[in-house]
UniProtKB/Swiss-Prot annotation:
A GO cellular-component term linked to this record: plasma membrane
Chain ranges on the Cytoplasmic side, renumbered to this chain: 1-29
Record organism: Brucella anthropi (strain ATCC 49188 / DSM 6882 / CCUG 24695 / JCM 21032 / LMG 3331 / NBRC 15819 / NCTC 12168 / Alc 37)
Chief site of localization: membrane
InterPro entries: CcmE (IPR004329), CcmE-like_sf (IPR036127), NA-bd_OB-fold (IPR012340)
Localization annotation: Cell inner membrane
Protein family per UniProt: Belongs to the CcmE/CycJ family.
Protein name: Cytochrome c-type biogenesis protein CcmE
One family name in Pfam for this protein: CcmE
């Protein structure tokens, strides 16, 4: 009996079939690796899109576009509390944020920070309502009478309206 006939009698597969199954395994492994890389690429892309909205700490009133006002997406609005703009109506605190170029009306429901006052730096987090008023659910104020957030000071300096240090 020849060697091939003996191998066939013992149940061994012919060499041609073995080569075919190896190439099928390689192909399956390649598809599996390719699929995993595609899923990973999509996941990284989605994460980058989610983080891209939080790259800037806040937007000033002059930075806002019609799209920001209409989209309903959350962001941080930074600027100075305009003198004479603070009022209380029930549990709502109403004030205007300015960067001395443009102003935005803000409504905040809650207790403002202890250091919140007119003429001071503020960052309000929320979204625009249908009425065009910024609805803040979180308000951050400056630390002391000489402090203005660095990002806000830099932004105001760029616009040529900053008179501080």
């Amino acid at each position: 009996m020849s060697a091939t006939a003996e191998d066939n009698a013992r149940g061994a597969k012919p060499a041609g079939n073995f080569a075919r199954t190896v190439s099928q395994r390689k192909r399956k492994r390649l598809f599996l690796i390719g699929g995993a890389l595609a899923v990973l690429a999509v996941a990284v892309g989605l994460m980058l899109m989610a983080f891209s909205q939080d790259i800037r700490f806040f937007r000033t009133p002059a930075d806002l576009t019609e799209q920001d006002m209409a989209s309903g997406s959350r962001f941080r609005l930074g600027g100075l509390v305009e003198e004479g703009s603070v009022s209380r109506e029930g549990s709502e605190l109403r004030f205007t944020v300015t960067d001395t170029i443009k102003t935005v009306k803000v409504v905040f429901e809650g207790i403002p920070p202890d250091l919140f006052r007119e003429g001071q730096g503020v960052v309000a987090e929320g979204r625009f309502g249908d009425d065009g008023v910024f609805r803040a659910d979180n308000v951050l104020a400056k630390h002391d009478e000489n402090y203005v957030p660095k990002d806000l000071a830099d932004s105001l300096k760029e616009k040529g309206v900053w008179e501080g240090k």
